[in-house]
Structures are given as C-alpha cells and as structure tokens.
Amino acid sequence: FFFQAEDGIRDVAVTGVQTCALPIYAHAAAVPLTGLTAWQALFEHAQLQPGQRVLIQSGAGGVGSFAIQLAKARGLHVISTASAGNLDLLRELGADQVIDYNAVQFEKEVSGVDAVIDGMAGEVRERSWKTLQPGGLLIALTGAPPTDAMAAERGYRQTTMLVHPDRAQLTEIAALIDAGKVRPILEAVIPLAETARAHRLSEGGHARGKIVLQVV
C-alpha cells in the first residue's frame, strides 16, 4: 500500500509475504485509509476488548463497513445503524444488532455501549451520547469536534481522531483479509475523468462502501 507516497513512481519487487489476497486493484485501493481509520478508532483510541459493545453509526459506509468486520474479528458485540436498504449488508458483515435509523430512534433501542464510532455528527451525535454507559467513549470521525467539557457534562469521554499511517496495523488488516474475515466494500469504481460524479455520489451521504477513482 503506497499510503505515504505521493508525486512519484518506480518499479518495485515484493515477496509473497508482502501481499494480500486482493487481486482487483480497486479493492486494494479501498483498504488503507478506511481500514486504518476503523482500526485506530476501535483499538487505538477506544482500546476495545473482546466482549465489549460498540455502536457503529452508518455501518454501510466505507469506514463503518470496515469497523463492523474488524470489531467482529476481535470478538466485540457490534450494533450498527443504516437505512433499510443496507440492513442486510450490515448483517452480512457480522453486526449483532442492526437498526434502521429512518424507522426508529436508535437511542431508544441501544444503551450501555462502551464506545460509539460516529461518522455522522450533528443531531445524530447528540443522540449518540445517550447510548453510552457511564464513562463510555464517543469517537468523532467528522464534523465539529465535541469538547471534553461537553462530554463531562454528560458523564462520558470523547475524542476526535485523525488517522495516521501505520505499517504494523496495515499488516494485521492484510492478514485478516487473507483469512477471509475482512473484505473492502465498494460502491463504485469511477474513471478519474469523472471525478465530479464521484464527489456528487460521496456528498449524497448514501454510498455503500468506498468510492474508488480509477486512474488508468
């Protein structure tokens, strides 16, 4: 994965142990950013352990779909939200409880979770606080970050994360892909010349998995 490289190209040779089972380049391109974001939220910031409970908002998205699979691979109890048309995908990815956020108020269905992975912000974040157990952690992936004071007023903790490159974590994710426990979900592979269409699709907020731009 050329996660830290930019503005350069060269020939390289890799051994079999440096590769993973993703024969389609678009699938490989979908792994580093979303995979590391999900991994670092779950295991670096929240430090979740087997048996703990996590609420993953927007589980059908790029980060959410990775987070569900990584959490289940670690033995977590996963609750996730999505629109009705994506609930089957969440179940397929391993979520223990799925919630249609358009049909019910998720905060009335969920309580006592150890962490919330929130990629939606706004009023969804405000409602997400109510699902945490005392001292639970809300991890904000987007939007205006909550403050420690806001969290303390509610009896919880919060953090805002910015993903960083990590070769060891990518190696662990690759091993899970090889083992068939994790797979990237793609909404679309779009030619670079149609970047504007890709942006419109992304900004619509209903992409199922990752949108990948194809350079050649």
Task: List each model region and its residues.
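Terminal helix/beta-alpha structural elements that buttress the NAD(P)+-binding lobe
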Residues: 18-216
